[in-house]
């Protein structure tokens, strides 16, 4: 086998592994972004723990088929970049959506969230969700509210009894 074919097979395997392992994968069209804008986008994604790479569409199609995500192939036309996140489901959608609001050249095409194909509208809906940490803090505050109210009521009763006893 030639060296070129081996290299391409390694890239296909790498992409397929990333597709399988990532919780969130977003495909974007980056045509029209300047080098400085693309660099800024990469920086923001890196800070959010998201990997952002450009692959040949033909190799990405083969990888999507081998990762059993062939429905992603219809969105692989033109210059594409793919954002992979193994940790946070919301992070790539949030960063890309915020960046796309300020830079019309960036177009979100589709994504795969936990193995399910999602459209542009679904990616935008996910982008409006708070991060995992934000959701956990909201849940914690909801769980603490009844306990806090009970403690305040108990304290008020104790203070009232002290006033009556004094």
UniProtKB/Swiss-Prot annotation:
Q: Which PROSITE patterns match?
A: RIBOSOMAL_L10 (PS01109)
List the CDD domains hit by this protein, alphabetically: Ribosomal_L10
Q: Which InterPro entries has this protein been placed in?
A: Ribosomal_uL10, Ribosomal_uL10-like_sf, Ribosomal_uL10_bac, Ribosomal_uL10_bac_type, Ribosomal_uL10_CS_bac
GO MF terms held by the record? large ribosomal subunit rRNA binding; structural constituent of ribosome
Q: What exactly does this protein do?
A: Forms part of the ribosomal stalk, playing a central role in the interaction of the ribosome with GTP-bound translation factors.
**Protein name as it appears in the record:** Large ribosomal subunit protein uL10
- Could you say which residues form the signal peptide? none
| SUBUNIT field | Part of the ribosomal stalk of the 50S ribosomal subunit. The N-terminus interacts with L11 and the large rRNA to form the base of the stalk. The C-terminus forms an elongated spine to which L12 dimers bind in a sequential fashion forming a multimeric L10(L12)X complex.
Q: Spell out the HAMAP family in the cross-references.
A: Ribosomal_uL10
Pfam family for this entry, one: Ribosomal_L10
Look up the record and give one Gene Ontology term from the biological process aspect: translation
Tell me its family. Answer: Belongs to the universal ribosomal protein uL10 family.
Organism, as annotated: Bacillus cereus (strain G9842)
Gene behind this chain? rplJ
């Amino acid at each position: 086998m030639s060296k070129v074919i081996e290299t391409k097979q390694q890239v296909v395997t790498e992409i397929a592994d990333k597709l399988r392992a990532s919780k969130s994968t977003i495909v974007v069209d980056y045509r029209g972004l300047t080098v400085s804008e693309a660099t800024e986008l990469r920086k923001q994604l890196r800070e959010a723990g998201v990997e952002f790479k450009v692959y040949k569409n033909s190799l990405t199609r083969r990888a999507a088929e081998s990762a059993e995500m062939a429905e992603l192939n219809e969105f692989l036309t033109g210059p594409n970049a793919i954002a992979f996140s193994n940790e946070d489901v919301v992070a790539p959608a949030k960063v890309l959506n915020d960046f796309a609001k300020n830079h019309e050249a960036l177009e979100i095409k589709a994504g795969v969230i936990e193995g399910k194909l999602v459209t542009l509208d679904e990616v935008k809906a996910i982008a409006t969700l708070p991060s995992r940490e934000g959701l956990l803090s909201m849940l914690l505050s909801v769980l603490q509210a009844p306990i806090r109210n009970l403690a305040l009521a108990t304290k008020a009763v104790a203070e009232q009894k002290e006033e009556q006893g004094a």
